A protein has these predicted regions:
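N-terminal glycine-/serine-/threonine-rich phosphate-binding loop
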Residues: 9-52, 56
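Mg2+-dependent phosphoryl-transfer enzymes with acidic/Ser/Thr/Gly-rich catalytic loops
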Residues: 13-22, 39, 204-289
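Residue-level signal for inorganic ion chemistry
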Residues: 29, 49, 84, 169, ...
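Active-site phosphate-binding/coordination module
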Residues: 38-141
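Hydrophobic packing residues within well-ordered alpha-helices of enzyme cores
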Residues: 42, 67-71, 181, 185, ...
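Short active-site oxyanion
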Residues: 51-57, 76-78, 168, 227-229, ...
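Short, structured coil segments at secondary-structure junctions
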Residues: 73-76, 83-84, 188-190, 244-245, ...
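Conserved acidic, metal-coordinating active-site core of Asp-based
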Residues: 119-232, 236-241
Length: 289
């Protein structure tokens, strides 16, 4: 992709100089383009971040194994926030995790089954720390699950898997989940937190789990302040990232709720918006000895 200069509407609000230590970016709809591809310049730009002493930390609803598979060696030394904040790691070190109870996971599975029986075209993923499980195995649903879960196992009955280490129950609705099955799912398991993470996905996690909470854990682990943190997002499961970063960027393609929460805007994910803005932030970043 040809490098394009940032338009004045993106540049004008930015501080002239920043002390930047941590850049956190969502994946789908944010870093990844409209065809599901990682930016070709990611290795180059992340190398420049590291040379400047800035940590690069992807934060996604995706599974940890999927993040590592999709991003490859570029994140070998990066902290990763996975499963919409329910898990944060750095290498083999677990920095943070939040799980839901076996009873909550079972109720979520049962509710999704009831919705499917009543005509909703939904499928369920039960995400644990090392593997994710599905019981629906038709090609259409399997293709969607495999986009986000590299370590994926098909079972006959989700109720038979160990439910005591569940990070997230994710439900995929082939229709618009925000205006469809999400309300019934949220009402059926009120003790869990629900977040629409895209047009078709809803995540059911611990009420304590969020990308923002995982970000706070990373900041504590590395001694980084909110004013030294930049975040990029596009959808509602990114929302509380903005509470913990002074440099909060909404993609121009973001949900209205994200645009309202963010102090700044970046070009769309289809326009290499994250990397173009990161390069500008690097130019404005205060040099440190």
């Amino acid at each position: 992709m040809k490098r394009l200069p940032l338009e004045s509407e993106y540049l004008a609000p930015l501080p002239a100089e920043i002390d930047l230590r941590l850049i956190v970016t969502d994946m789908d709809g944010t870093l990844i383009d409209g065809d599901g591809r990682v930016p070709v310049r990611l290795d180059e730009v992340v190398a420049r971040m590291r040379e400047a002493g800035i940590i690069f930390a992807p934060a996604s609803g995706r599974q940890l194994a999927n993040l590592r598979a999709v991003l490859g060696h570029v994140v070998d030394d990066s902290p990763l926030i996975a499963e919409s904040g329910a898990l944060a790691v750095h290498g083999n070190e677990e920095i943070h995790s939040d799980t839901i109870s076996a009873e909550e996971a079972g109720a979520a599975i049962a509710t999704a089954r009831e919705l499917a029986s009543s005509g909703y075209d939904v499928g369920t993923v039960v995400a644990c720390k090392r593997c994710a499980y599905i019981e629906r195995s038709d090609p259409a649903f399997l293709a969607q699950a495999r986009l986000y879960y590299a370590a994926l196992e098909i079972v006959d009955d989700l109720m038979t898997i160990p439910l005591d280490e569940v990070l997230k129950v994710a439900v995929f609705d082939f229709d618009d989940i925000e205006n469809g099955s999400s309300q019934a799912l949220a009402a059926a398991v009120p003790s869990v937190q629900t977040a629409v993470s895209g047009l078709h996905w809803m995540d059911m996690t611990s009420p304590h789990a969020s990308k923002g909470r995982a970000l706070v854990a990373l900041q504590a682990r590395f001694g980084i302040l909110p004013e030294q943190t930049a975040v990029f997002g596009d959808y509602l499961n990114d929302l509380d990232l903005y509470e913990h970063a002074d440099l909060g960027f909404a993609m121009s393609n973001a949900h209205p709720g994200i645009r309202a929460a963010a102090a700044f805007t970046a070009p769309a994910n289809t326009e290499d918006g994250v990397l173009r803005m990161v390069e500008e932030l690097l130019r404005r970043s205060r040099r440190r000895d």
